[in-house]
Amino acid sequence: MTINFLIAPDFPPEYYAGWHFLNTRLQRLIDAPVHLSMASNAEEEQQEIDKDNVDIIYANPFNASKLIRELDYLPVVKPVNCFDEMIIASSADSEIKSLADIKPGMSILCTENYDVKLIALRLLEAVDIDEKDLTWIKSESFAAVARGLIQKQGNIGLFMSSAYHKLTAITRSRLNLLIESKINDLYHLILLHPRNAEMLENLQNAFSTMRDTPAGEMLLEDLGLNDGFEVLKKEDVELLIDLIETLRD
């Protein structure tokens, strides 16, 4: 039986090859066929979940929390020292130089990443801005958010920190970083569908030992996962879910 492994649509295209290399190594470690899928957007990701096509998923913390609570997905591993932070930015030649310069009625470029938006809204509370005060403009990718800011299609833009720092130096020089979150408790998780519960320990061993060889270390570094994965403890999961609920309130 082939196992279906879905990757959240949160990563730049240059990571695609790296995920396929990781999947090849995973198949060797667990001695089972694994079919890798890269969701192109949040809607496609949800469709695969709704169709019950997902056995393993690398999900953002907000989706992971929902999958654990509502569909009984099992936590497998989390990346070590790799947190989900976000950045609010403006165009370098914009008059917006700090959060205090953001005013009601301004437009904001963002992707479908709900986690990025939710963290941004919490940061904007500091300057008395809430969701209804802004005009939200959907962008297909973080690169598109950057282009939109440079082309004056929006006043501010939202990025995953990892995506922002992967932009070219020239692109970043044309942007102004207003604020970067420092939560340090949010991270993507690898989850397992409960119907595959018998695979849990095998998967945990495979992911947590992937960095133990030079080849494994190299492929993880190519994905920005320099310190590899570690098995999730029960208290880690409980803390993450509590934090998600706090951010949503």
Regions from the PLM with identified roles:
Residues 1-9, 81-90, 172-210, 225-243:
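Periplasmic-binding protein-like
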Residues 3-29, 85-146, 162:
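Bilobed "Venus flytrap"/periplasmic-binding protein-like clamshell domains
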Residues 58-70, 148-174:
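A ligand-binding cleft/hinge motif common to bilobed small-molecule-binding domains
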Residues 74-79, 131-136, 157, 176-180:
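Short hydrophobic/aromatic-enriched beta-strand-loop microsegments
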Residues 36-47, 132-147, 184-185:
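Short helix-initiation/N-cap motifs at beta->coil->alpha
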Residues 1-53, 59-62, 215-249:
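N-terminal hydrophobic or amphipathic helices and topogenic motifs
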Residues 47-101:
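Acidic, polar ligand-binding/catalytic clefts
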